[in-house]
Amino acid sequence: MGAQSDHHMTGAARFVISVDAMGGDEGPAAVVAGMAMSAAKNLRIGFILHGPEGKLAPLVAKRRELAGRVEIRDAPQVVEMNDKPSQVVRHGRDSSMWSAIESVRAGEATVCVSCGNTGALMLMSVIRLRKLPGIYRPAIAVMWPSQNPQQHNIMLDGGADIRADAKDLMQYALMGASYARNGFGLTCPRVGLLNVGTEEHKGRAELRKAHDLIAANAKASDFEFVGFVEGRDLPGTICDVIVTDGFTGNVALKTGEGTAKLAGDLLREAFAYSPLSRLAALMAFTSLRRMKKRIDPRRANGGVFLGLNGTVVKSHGSADATGVSSAIKLAFELAQSNFTERLAARVAAAI
């Protein structure tokens, strides 16, 4: 199957997603279940599934939704979460992760989706897909639940590289704005630079330099720069894109996930406290379910590697079938919008 050459009987083009079946905490069964959920909702998705064929074939055969829509590529080796990226690159050419990326490199698939080791996935992606011309450091863009109309903000870098100088942060702003433009349909995304305060004199010298660089490039790149923002603005309405280095971004991401879990646990504990509180929970069930859906990390599952000659979506390692399906939905939307080509054009015009 070619990346966009397969056609459904209706005549509509089918977008092929390359899926790494191995490496996630839940194993290949959850990945295949997520694929089946996506296939049932969207007839325009096809898959190339990578992993040990002996394990994958029976799982796929059980899912009627996947009949005739999956090609299995036998890849016996599995990249584990504790494997060192440098070792994986040297010795992992028979792995499902390597094979999944190769399908994108060869043009057989439009996007790669993996739940595996983040460091190994990024290093493999950089080596096999290469960086876009002019990009210094690729970044991971993640979705953050927000009060904006699109219900999510974009934060990058989510952990691809703990280092980022002023030029890197400027490029993150450019790539993040392009992602928001294509993913959310925003004509002029608002971009903020994460700092310890909003005043222009605050923060490290490198951040102040990045502030000036982003401000100088905003108009030509069709985004609005709102200046420095603080951690409390991550879920807010001040901006649509938050730019930071990978260390800060990853700490913020994990803190947000932990806080969301704590809030959910405390709510369950409070509503189970007495018969009256249990009655209150029953009366508020619809509203609570709506709130849970808004902040459910599975709905925003999928960090996108930006700055490469190809699109890679990193799903959470602990993703269940719902989480995998969300990552595949994101991959389809990016493929449908020709995201990689549009991002490359934006970057080329800015350098």
What are these regions (language model features)?
Residues 2-57:
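N-terminal phosphate-binding or glycine-rich loops at protein starts, especially the Walker A/P-loop
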Residues 17-29, 89, 160-170, 314-321:
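Short, glycine-rich nucleotide/cofactor-binding loops
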Residues 20, 50-51, 73, 114-116, ...:
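Short beta-strand segments
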Residues 25-32, 56, 93-107, 111-125, ...:
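Short glycine/serine/threonine-rich phosphate/pyrophosphate-binding segments
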Residues 29-30, 42-48, 54-57, 162-231, ...:
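Glycine-rich phosphate/diphosphate-binding loop of Rossmann-like nucleotide-binding domains
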Residues 53-54, 76-78, 119, 160-162, ...:
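Glycine-rich beta-alpha junction loops
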Residues 64-109:
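Phosphate/nucleotide-donor binding subsite
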Residues 126-151, 155, 238-242, 246-351:
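Glycine-rich phosphate/nucleotide-binding loop
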